[in-house]
Amino acid sequence: MSKAKFERTKPHVNIGTIGHVDHGKTSLTAAITKVLGFQGKANYTSYENIDKAPEERERGITISTSHVEYETDNRHYAHVDCPGHADYVKNMITGAAQMDGAILVVSAADGPMPQTREHILLARQVGVPYIVVFLNKCDMVDDEELLELVEMEIRELLNTYEFPGDEIPIIRGSALAALESTATSVDAPEYQPILKLMEEVDKYIPTPQRDIDKPFAMPVEDVFTITGRGTVATGRVERGTLKMGDEVEIVGLSDSPKKTVVTGIEMFRKLLDQAVAGDNIGALLRGIQRNEVERGQVLAKPGSIKPHTYFEAQVYVLTKEEGGRHTPFFNNYRPQFYFRTTDVTGVVELPQGTEMVMPGDHITMKVKLITPVAMEEGLKFAIREGGRTVGAGNVSKIIE
């Protein structure tokens, strides 16, 4: 098959497969590329190629993830699949690949298992907004009643973690049957569940709002003064657009944001009328002294982000092999929390009944920072000690 050129005109959606080990996540990923490949909408990627995922380093953490891309009539998809359970936990917490939706794979022969539960919980905590279920290995179960029982169990589990379990589409099929089939026509019966799944993903997972359409935010990386013109803050626009004359707030590292107006935008030494998500810019700030803005603050559309000091987070603690701590930590542990462009010291509160946290653990904890940081739910951070990363986290709930 000739390499189909992916048209970038279609809306783009990031998805991934989640679920218990050996329930068929990687087989399903391969089957999707095979079946869509018949329609010229994907390049078939074999199970072996997905399974030997390359290791990537994200914020100093090694994660194995496989990325495949494919398209349907309506959309372009980037799809992540992780070989190991620890890779999923790390991937979902660090947001190496932020998912707009996930395909939960459950083996019909086994029903929901411990990691099924953990992945649903993680999806809830780190803000994966939509789940579609693929009930795999249905060819191994002859009993229709058993299939219905497993479906009920899955729906109950989803409801437990505040997903709309009763509305979520569940598609029955067999990824292996699709992979092993020698049929070259996309109309073969064993390929229908895969096509049905993609149809449901298209329908059920909404197209995400693009970064450029969100309210403006730019983490400040550096600040300098231009004699006669004023103070310039530089950084990469995280989201939204900024036009000359826009009012912005300087948020974080102080209790209340400071308002100012952007009187000039510069990129590569040229003046711009406007900057968009992804641009590296310098913003000239009216009436702001050199000491009133610093690295670690965020320029943002007024009212869109607030400074906070106390939050709950999902945290993955690095193992010794990953360069993390060699010993556990306890309540009142005081590391640095690295948000966007700066470190702030914080105090850790462990959940009741948790004596200590070991390297390699995934834990929910509360953190009290000594200085406010521009923060919203879903924000990623690293935990550092003396400049080295010892953990990664995701703000799951702001307390104050």
Curated annotation (Swiss-Prot):
Compartment(s) where it occurs, according to its Swiss-Prot or TrEMBL record: Cytoplasm
Reactions this protein catalyses: GTP + H2O = GDP + phosphate + H(+)
Assigned EC number: 3.6.5.3
Region (G3) residue spans: 81-84
Keywords attached to this entry: Cytoplasm, Elongation factor, GTP-binding, Hydrolase, Magnesium, Metal-binding, Nucleotide-binding, Protein biosynthesis
InterPro entries per record: EF-Tu_GTP-bd, EF-Tu_GTPase, EFTu-like_2, EFTU_2, G_TR_CS, P-loop_NTPase, Small_GTP-bd, T_Tr_GTP-bd_dom
Main location class: cytoplasm
Pfam families to which the protein is assigned, alphabetical: GTP_EFTU (PF00009), GTP_EFTU_D2 (PF03144), GTP_EFTU_D3 (PF03143)
Domain tr-type G: start-end pairs: 10-209
G4: annotated span: 136-139
NCBIfam families (UniProt xref): EF-Tu, PRK00049.1, PRK12735.1, PRK12736.1, small_GTP
CDD domains registered for this protein in UniProt: EF_Tu (cd01884), EFTU_II (cd03697), EFTU_III (cd03707)
Name this protein carries in UniProt: Elongation factor Tu
Name of the coding gene: tuf
Record function comment: GTP hydrolase that promotes the GTP-dependent binding of aminoacyl-tRNA to the A-site of ribosomes during protein biosynthesis.
Annotated spans, G5: 174-176
Region (G1): 19-26
MF terms (GO), sorted A to Z: GTP binding; GTPase activity; translation elongation factor activity
Region annotation (G2) ranges: 60-64
Positions with a binding annotation for Mg(2+): T26
Binding site for GTP: 19-26, 81-85, 136-139
Record-level GO cellular component terms: cytosol
Family statement drawn from the similarity comment of this UniProt entry: Belongs to the TRAFAC class translation factor GTPase superfamily. Classic translation factor GTPase family. EF-Tu/EF-1A subfamily.
PROSITE patterns listed in its UniProt record: G_TR_1, G_TR_2
